[in-house]
């Protein structure tokens, strides 16, 4: 049994301070306790060992308690944020235990309490948060039938930094996609026994925290949510069909409030999300399209990194949300594109550039508001909030010139009206450039509080008093080099050099002796010292009290601050979209109620930004042309063409302009991709199993309004199995799903599909051979490709020439055999077919030799017998003529 899990009787054996620590630790099991002692946060026992390992701290042992040495590790209080950030990144939670009692008046250990708990999903401090990423805490409540099988899952997730709360209720098989979209930092689940849990969260759920089952009670959750939102019922939020989502919301709010140690004053609204509201993007699609993260796990180059020229971090975070939540309703996208068009067509002084210049002066008031609601806002948060509000009139004046041309801009303009009472309060109360921390003083503006001003005057007039006293004492004592000074250790003093001490008056009292001087204090100086130091301490205490009262006074303005923050984020993102459209030559797409996708001269937005020249291509998918069979060489651009089609469609529905000459879209409900594959070792699935699982999801869920991207389906198994599966899948997509499909393949047998299904069409990526090499044209043309150029691509990849030669010879053999008679399916364990070995062994295979003309054999033999280093110039010239004659022989042309 560890010392931290000691029983009550064991605790009594410890020192009073350790008893206090163990009681606090018992209330926070599984959490590192940062226990404040003076200027340090200390960790003890197992916590100390763990923190020393994770944070690379020195582990020490000091003294003993209950007969055991006390293991300790500590971090300075002024640098605690950097340690918290590292621990949270590692998925740890930390309880911050502060001294709340006065050491001077405490009997026994100073009173301490946990003031907040920092967990991966409840971050609000600027030092712990990524500027451009939201952090979500999510709770998951599972409903079961009588047999214990999960039937539905209620989700509630909260961005504590902004106060945004959302709910959803899904089928169990939809949860993985939802978690991929939300990306929660921490997930709350019921702490149920392992044998009673019939369903466990997916592996991408984030840091798991188990809480008591009763936290998820649906009735209690409903009441807790009503209390939080200050409403009598929840029907007004469009959530009448939910059940277990209420339980998830209750557990979420209970946990979040407990970690903060106070009410969540900024959580005042609720949004219920339904699957039908957004274009469906499964986890594979989000990864393959590289919306916010590359396949290598980096943030650039991605669609988000290309689009993110936002001037505020609020706009950057909203961009990520929009990319992962493209609305199905085209009216939303059209409204955004109308706003972008109005900004691009605005008169000078009111367009994209001027608005973006004004937006650069805006602070992250969304997160400032969150900290204000939790009473953790720092002085510079308040000055930033004030300065942002002061800058709004200029921004609104520019916006007024274009807002009549777009309903979205008019709505944003109206939402940018700052709360004037809040602005005036901040103007009066907060210093122009306040200190970083309240404890440093200089936070409250002069003129706001008469008592504080008086105390400051006493403290700040010390300099003049000391100058006057020094002048008087020099005249009184006749000591010309006498000095009156102050330091934090000894306070105020009069310094006299050792050679002048005989002139010191009787009322001087020695305070400190130095090597070459003596320091004294007089009754007058002592009286002033008491008054000045007392005034400084009282001023800091008064300022702390005023600051706390100011935070309370600002709480009623939180809804207004949230309204302004939301409008600023949207305006910033629309302006960024406008800047991207202009800089990258993008156009506004159009929408139609009729099914189809028409893209003229479309480009891949991310790839185009990485290369000097990009070949644009058309894509036409209509009710009469549902499936495009795409053939062509590897590296020819098939995957790029497919991805760019999906990205252009996604951008259109997000509300951005798109990289094309023209683009038109009908309704799209989901986008599926089956591009590339890797095995899932953790899940025990092979590459082919992953491929088939993704294909199954598409075949089961795709509708006539879905866009499907299929790349090289069936390649993970034997040739005929793969071909048969690819053929059947393509047929099913046409005959049953009826979805818009881009189907890339190397199975040329599939190019016969349009003969059976007129809704299928062949296109190919062009390439031309140059010697034994290949030049990719990256242009999409009608009709099937005539070959796949696999050997040329292998040569480009650096495959040794000997291997390429052997492959080329064996390819010729296979083609000859295929022309002569049908070839059996290749089998991994069958006896090898006759084939040419490398180098000298190649020539011993008579069947392969028969494919090479005699003159060409003679030419090769002659070349192999030449050592260029032994040739003289004349010999080299004669040899060149000889080789030319051999190559010109009639049967040498092969």
Swiss-Prot record:
GO cellular component annotations of the record: cytosol
Any matching Pfam family: MutS_V
CDD domains membership: ABC_MutS1
Keyword Nucleotide-binding: yes
Keywords for this protein: ATP-binding, DNA damage, DNA repair, DNA-binding, Nucleotide-binding
SMART domains, per database record: MUTSac (SM00534), MUTSd (SM00533)
InterPro entries according to UniProt: DNA_mismatch_repair_MutS, DNA_mismatch_repair_MutS-lik_N, DNA_mismatch_repair_MutS/MSH, DNA_mismatch_repair_MutS_C, DNA_mismatch_repair_MutS_clamp, DNA_mismatch_repair_MutS_core, DNA_mismatch_repair_MutS_N, DNA_mismatch_repair_MutS_sf
GO molecular function: ATP binding; ATP-dependent DNA damage sensor activity; damaged DNA binding; mismatched DNA binding
Gene3D superfamilies: 1.10.1420.10, 6.10.140.430, DNA repair protein MutS, domain I (3.40.1170.10), MutS, connector domain (3.30.420.110), P-loop containing nucleotide triphosphate hydrolases (3.40.50.300)
SUPFAM superfamilies: DNA repair protein MutS, domain I, DNA repair protein MutS, domain II, DNA repair protein MutS, domain III, P-loop containing nucleoside triphosphate hydrolases
GO biological process, one term: mismatch repair
Nucleotide-binding is among the record's keywords: yes
Family to which the UniProt record says this protein belongs: Belongs to the DNA mismatch repair MutS family.
HAMAP family: MutS
Protein's UniProt name: DNA mismatch repair protein MutS
Annotated organism of origin: Paraburkholderia xenovorans (strain LB400)
Source lineage: Bacteria, Pseudomonadati, Pseudomonadota, Betaproteobacteria, Burkholderiales
Gene (UniProt): mutS
């Amino acid at each position: 049994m560890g010392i931290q899990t000691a029983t009550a009787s064991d605790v009594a054996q410890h020192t009073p301070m350790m008893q206090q620590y163990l009681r606090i630790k018992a209330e926070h099991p599984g959490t590192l306790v940062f226990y404040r002692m003076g200027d340090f946060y200390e960790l003890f026992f197992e916590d100390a060992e763990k923190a020393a390992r994770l944070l690379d701290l020195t582990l020490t042992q000091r003294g003993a308690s209950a007969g055991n040495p006390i293991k300790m590790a500590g971090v300075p209080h002024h640098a605690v944020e950097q340690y918290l950030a590292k621990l949270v990144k590692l998925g740890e939670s930390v309880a911050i235990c502060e001294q709340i009692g006065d050491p001077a008046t405490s009997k026994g250990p100073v009173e301490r309490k946990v003031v907040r708990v920092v967990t991966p999903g409840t971050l609000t401090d600027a030092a712990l948060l990524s500027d451009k990423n939201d952090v979500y805490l999510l709770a998951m409540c599972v409903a079961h039938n009588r047999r214990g099988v999960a039937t539905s899952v209620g989700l509630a997730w909260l961005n504590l930094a902004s106060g945004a709360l959302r709910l959803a209720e899904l089928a169990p098989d939809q949860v993985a996609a939802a978690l991929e979209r939300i990306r929660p930092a921490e997930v709350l689940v019921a702490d149920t026994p392992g044998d009673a849990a019939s369903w466990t969260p997916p592996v991408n759920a984030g840091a798991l925290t188990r809480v008591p089952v009763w936290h998820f009670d649906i009735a209690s959750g409903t009441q807790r949510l009503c209390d939080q939102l200050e409403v009598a019922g929840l029907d007004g939020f469009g959530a009448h069909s939910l059940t277990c989502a209420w339980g998830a919301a209750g557990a979420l709010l209970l946990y979040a409030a407990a970690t903060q140690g106070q009410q969540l004053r900024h959580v005042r609204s609720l949004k219920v999300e339904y699957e039908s509201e957004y274009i469906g993007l499964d986890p594979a699609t989000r990864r393959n399209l590289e919306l916010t993260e590359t396949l290598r796990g980096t943030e650039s180059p991605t669609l988000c990194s290309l689009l993110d020229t936002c001037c505020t971090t609020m706009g950057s975070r909203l961009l990520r949300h929009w990319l992962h939540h493209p609305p199905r309703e085209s009216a939303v996208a059209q409204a955004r594109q109308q706003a972008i068009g109005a900004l691009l067509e605005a008169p000078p002084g009111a367009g994209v550039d001027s608005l973006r210049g004004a937006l650069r002066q805006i602070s992250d008031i969304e997160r400032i508001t969150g900290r204000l609601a939790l009473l953790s806002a720092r002085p510079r948060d308040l000055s930033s909030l004030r300065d942002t509000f002061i800058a709004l009139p200029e921004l609104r004046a520019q916006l007024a010139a274009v807002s009549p041309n777009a309903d979205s801009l008019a709505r944003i303009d109206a939402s940018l009206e700052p709360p004037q009472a809040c602005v005036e309060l901040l103007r009066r109360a907060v210093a122009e450039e306040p200190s970083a921390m309240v404890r440093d003083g200089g936070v409250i503006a002069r003129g706001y509080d008469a008592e504080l001003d008086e105390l400051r005057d006493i403290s700040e007039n010390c300099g003049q008093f000391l100058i006057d006293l020094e002048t008087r004492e020099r005249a009184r004592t006749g000591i010309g080099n006498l000095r009156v000074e102050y330091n934090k250790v000894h306070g105020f003093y009069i310094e006299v050099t050792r050679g002048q001490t005989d002139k010191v008056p009787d009322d001087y009292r020695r305070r400190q002796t130095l090597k070459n001087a003596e320091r004294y204090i007089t009754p007058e100086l002592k009286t002033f010292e008491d008054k000045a130091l007392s005034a400084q301490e009282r001023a800091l205490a008064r300022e702390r009290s005023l600051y706390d009262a100011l935070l309370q006074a600002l709480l009623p303005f939180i809804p207004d601050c949230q309204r302004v923050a939301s409008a600023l984020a949207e305006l910033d993102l629309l302006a960024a979209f406008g800047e991207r459209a202009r800089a990258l030559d993008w156009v506004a797409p159009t929408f139609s109620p009729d099914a189809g996708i028409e893209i003229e001269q479309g480009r891949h937005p991310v790839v185009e930004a990485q290369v000097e020249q990009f070949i644009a291509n058309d894509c036409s998918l209509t009710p009469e042309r549902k499936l495009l069979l795409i053939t062509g060489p590897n590296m020819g651009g098939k995957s790029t063409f497919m991805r760019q089609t999906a990205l252009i469609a996604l951008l259109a529905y997000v509300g951005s302009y798109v990289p094309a000459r023209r683009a038109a879209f009908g309704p799209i409900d989901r986008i599926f991709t089956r591009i590339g594959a890797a095995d899932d070792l953790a899940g025990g699935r092979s590459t082919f199993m992953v491929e088939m699982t993704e294909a199954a999801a598409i075949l089961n869920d795709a509708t006539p309004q879905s866009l499907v991207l299929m790349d090289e389906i069936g390649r993970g198994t034997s040739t005929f199995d793969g071909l048969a599966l690819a053929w059947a899948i393509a047929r099913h997509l046409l005959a049953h799903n009826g979805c818009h499909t881009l189907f890339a393949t190397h199975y040329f047998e599939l190019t016969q599909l349009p003969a059976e299904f007129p809704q299928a069409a062949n296109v190919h990526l062009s390439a031309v051979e140059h010697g034994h090499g290949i030049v990719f044209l990256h242009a999409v043309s009608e009709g099937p490709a005539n070959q796949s150029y696999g050997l040329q691509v292998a040569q480009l990849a650096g495959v040794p020439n000997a291997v390429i030669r052997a492959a080329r010879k064996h390819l010729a053999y296979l083609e000859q055999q295929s022309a002569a008679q049908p070839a059996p399916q290749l089998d991994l364990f069958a006896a090898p077919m006759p084939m040419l070995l490398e180098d000298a062994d190649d020539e011993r295979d008579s069947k392969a030799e028969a494919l090479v003309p005699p003159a060409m054999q003679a030419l090769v033999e002659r070349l192999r017998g030449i050592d260029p280093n032994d040739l003289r110039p004349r010999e080299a010239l004669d040899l060149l003529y000889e080789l030319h004659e051999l190559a010109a022989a009639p049967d040498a042309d092969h």
